[in-house]
């Protein structure tokens, strides 16, 4: 069975048992009345069952309801169908004040019907010939308004300075000021020039997201013809059907696939209603993607440390034990499905590098947009500053130093022999984003 953990807030007067049963019925075989066609099938075989209910600590009107769904309710290899059933009409149910899907347990039998990520962590490292450290990226800013040629210039400066990747912003598609084909051409020129100068393999996430699946695939085909290593998709706004189609194309044609989670906070940020991001992360691993944005813990975007590390493990590891202290409700076995690299992006700069290296480890992408292009000397020096900071943190970690305790000292030591890093340290020494997270663990 597929197991689901729902956070249920019933209307006043509705007992939790009734609310849990209603969720199970409405998201499987049930409707609001008995119908004569119920007798034409075996409902006991197909109906969802609410098998356990527990109160939420610290809340008087919230319950975690566990529901089991028989596998025959779901089409093989379709995240779209899985979500249509489990989180379809039930979220508008009048008997509930709020409903949130906290976690899913996907059984190996269903996982084996999915291709998953086009390539996975190890294949990506082999393609890029980069080992032993996190990868470095940068989102090109301003996100909208640059011409294709100026956009390509910004890409080149970042890549030659030492970054592994640059990135289209999620809302860069094909606008009047920069059509997609022009952007692809100038970015390809930039990365080939940077590769020739540095001797390193470089990439730019070319956003293939489009208004139709056909147009999206056309853009991915052109990227492959240019010989670039990676394309990008906005998987929530683009949709799971489009994402799975693109992931299959990328597997068949040797392209890596970077995934942006634009629109996720509309769905996952409120603690009592919606879908938790750990579920969206699991769905992405099934649908397919080699990278996905996962929050930073230390930057400008929402993300508590324990919760973030919980779904980072769900993205990367083969087997994850149940651990409620990190928000993981079920043990998950991914069998042979490749892993996804988490991307830390949003309001981060060189002073965050020790914490990011310690939190996310080697199999991650650390992405500095403003933290690269905001350098007072320009894009290339900004890239140099980030690369020097990263190499210093990795070396210190490998020597046994404690990044959490000595992080600032490590950055200061490195800045003594890197003027680019010293300038970056001076610019961002006072920049902090210290706000309390909205989505926290139940205690």
UniProtKB/Swiss-Prot annotation:
Could you give one GO CC term from the UniProt record? chloroplast
Annotated GO molecular function terms are: magnesium ion binding; monooxygenase activity; ribulose-bisphosphate carboxylase activity
Entry binding sites for substrate: 89, 139, 143, 261, 293, 345
Q: Where in the cell is it found?
A: Plastid, Chloroplast
Q: Which residues carry this modification: N6-carboxylysine?
A: 167
Q: Where is the active site?
A: 141 (proton acceptor), 260 (proton acceptor)
Instruction: Alphabetically list the UniProt keywords.
Output: Calvin cycle, Carbon dioxide fixation, Chloroplast, Disulfide bond, Lyase, Magnesium, Metal-binding, Monooxygenase, Oxidoreductase, Photorespiration, Photosynthesis, Plastid
Q: Where is this site: Transition state stabilizer?
A: 300
Names of the cofactor(s): Mg(2+)
**Maturation and modification:** The disulfide bond which can form in the large chain dimeric partners within the hexadecamer appears to be associated with oxidative stress and protein turnover.
User: What Pfam families does the entry give?
Assistant: RuBisCO_large, RuBisCO_large_N
As recorded in UniProt, its EC number(s) are 4.1.1.39
Q: Which HAMAP family does the record associate with it?
A: RuBisCO_L_type1 (MF_01338)
Protein task: RuBisCO catalyzes two reactions: the carboxylation of D-ribulose 1,5-bisphosphate, the primary event in carbon dioxide fixation, as well as the oxidative fragmentation of the pentose substrate in the photorespiration process. Both reactions occur simultaneously and in competition at the same active site.
Query: What else is noted?
Result: The basic functional RuBisCO is composed of a large chain homodimer in a 'head-to-tail' conformation. In form I RuBisCO this homodimer is arranged in a barrel-like tetramer with the small subunits forming a tetrameric 'cap' on each end of the 'barrel'.
Q: What is this protein called?
A: Ribulose bisphosphate carboxylase large chain
- Organism of origin is Buddleja davidii (Butterfly bush)
Q: What is the lineage of its organism?
A: Eukaryota, Viridiplantae, Streptophyta, Embryophyta, Tracheophyta
Q: Which gene encodes it?
A: rbcL
């Amino acid at each position: 069975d597929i197991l689901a953990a729902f956070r249920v807030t019933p209307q006043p007067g509705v007992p939790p048992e009734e609310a849990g049963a209603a969720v199970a019925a409405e998201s499987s075989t049930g409707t609001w009345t008995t119908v004569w066609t119920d007798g034409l099938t075996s409902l006991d075989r197909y109906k969802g069952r609410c098998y356990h209910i527990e109160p939420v600590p610290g809340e008087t009107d919230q319950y975690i309801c566990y529901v089991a769904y028989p596998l025959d309710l779901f089409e093989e290899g379709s995240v779209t169908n899985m979500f249509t059933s489990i989180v379809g009409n039930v979220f508008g149910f009048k008997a509930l004040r709020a409903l949130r899907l906290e976690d899913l347990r996907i059984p190996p039998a269903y996982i084996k019907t999915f291709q998953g990520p086009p390539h996975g962590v190890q294949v990506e490292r082999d393609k890029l010939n980069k080992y032993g450290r996190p990868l470095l990226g940068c989102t090109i800013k301003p996100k909208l308004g640059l011409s294709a040629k100026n956009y390509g210039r910004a890409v080149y400066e970042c890549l030659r300075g030492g970054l592994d990747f640059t990135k289209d912003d999620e809302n860069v598609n094909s606008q009047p000021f920069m059509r997609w084909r022009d952007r692809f051409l100038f970015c390809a020129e930039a990365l080939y020039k940077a590769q020739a100068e540095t001797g390193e393999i470089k990439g730019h996430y070319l956003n293939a997201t489009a208004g139709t699946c056909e147009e999206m695939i056309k853009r991915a085909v052109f990227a492959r013809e240019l010989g670039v290593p990676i394309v990008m998709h906005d998987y929530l706004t683009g949709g799971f059907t489009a994402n799975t189609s693109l992931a299959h194309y990328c597997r068949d044609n040797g392209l890596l696939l970077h995934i942006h989670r634009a629109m996720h906070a509309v769905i996952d940020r409120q603690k009592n209603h919606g879908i938790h991001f750990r579920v969206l992360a699991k769905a992405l691993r099934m649908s397919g993607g080699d990278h996905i944005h996962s929050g930073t813990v230390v930057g400008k975007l929402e993300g508590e440390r324990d919760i973030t590390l919980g779904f980072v493990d769900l993205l990367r590891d083969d087997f994850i034990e149940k651990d409620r202290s990190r928000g993981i409700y079920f043990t998950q076995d991914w069998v042979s499905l490749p892993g996804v690299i988490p991307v830390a992006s949003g309001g981060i700069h060189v002073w965050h590098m020790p914490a990011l290296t310690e939190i996310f480890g080697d199999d991650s992408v650390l992405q500095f947009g403003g933290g690269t292009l905001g350098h007072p000397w320009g894009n290339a020096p900004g890239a140099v500053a980030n690369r020097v900071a990263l190499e210093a943190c990795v070396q210190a970690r490998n020597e046994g130093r404690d990044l959490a305790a000595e992080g600032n000292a490590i950055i200061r030591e490195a800045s003594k022999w890197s003027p680019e890093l010293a300038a970056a340290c001076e610019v961002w020494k006072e920049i902090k984003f210290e706000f309390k997270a909205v989505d926290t663990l139940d205690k």
